[in-house]
Amino acid sequence: MSAPALEAIGLTHTFAAGTPSEQVALQAVDLVMEPRSWVVVLGANGSGKSTLLNAIAGSLIPDRGTVRVSGRDVTHWHEWRRSAVMGRVFQNPATGSIGHLTVAENLAVAAKRGRHRAVLRNPLSRAGRRDLADRVGELGLGLEDRLDTPVGALSGGQRQALTLLMATLVRPELLLLDEHTAALDPRSTEQVVQLTEGIIRKGGFTTLMVTHSMQQAVTLGDRVILMHRGRIVESIGGARKRQLRVEELLASFDRLRSADQVDESAAEMLRRLYI
């Protein structure tokens, strides 16, 4: 029997511990993902969802807990080393690519993901350019004709689509999507969401996706988990996930409020964010 694609066990982290600004971000969070599964993480600002993603990606080392990928303990691996087995798309389209390099050069860098201080030493061969053009052409954005265009000249949607391709160019054991449509306009968001679903389903990538969008949580993925105050408070999968509606998610947050886990102002913020 193969190991789970991801095991995050007992993740606990506190920012500014022992100071007046102390903030408990994660409280003994457990998350296990099977290969090819797609989990969507939903929660308000401060719920711990981004801290969870950062702990898995290696952007921060949790105070306690273990992270295993395909059975390997990566808890204390540096972020660049984890990038050999993880692909990540950030909220800001400019974060996952290098603006002054061309489309082709960015893809060439992505092909070296996980190698310490990977650099471009040789120009791309003609065959290499053709291969990159074919891969970029699959996005359907016309970027195959703009391989020599600096990435900084692309629109936010084009750049985020390219970053998604870069994150999956070398097959990752785990794909991390960190609110990757939050900075896009509605049209670009729809386009990138469609590309995301196509790439993940076609490639069978194990995916952990953080979002603020209830609509995305309903329509994407195999399981949605709700986070609040550093805990996973609900996990919805299987037939219930397939039949899930936005109204049911709203009801879940209302139940949290009535249980005195979310105050009235936070509940109102959730409605403004998610509807």
Identify the meaning behind each predicted range.
Residues 65-73, 234-236:
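Conserved ABC transporter NBD signature motif
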Residues 231-257:
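Conserved beta-strand-loop-alpha-helix hinge in the C-terminal portion
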Residues 42-44:
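The feature captures the beta-strand-to-loop junction immediately N-terminal to the Walker
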Residues 19, 73-87, 95, 118-121, ...:
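ABC ATPase NBD coupling module
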Residues 211-212:
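H-loop/switch region of ABC-family ATPase nucleotide-binding domains
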Residues 167-168:
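ABC ATPase C-loop
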Residues 2-5, 14-28, 78:
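A short, flexible loop at the N-terminus of ABC-type nucleotide-binding domains that lies
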Residues 57:
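Helix-to-loop junction immediately C-terminal to a conserved catalytic motif
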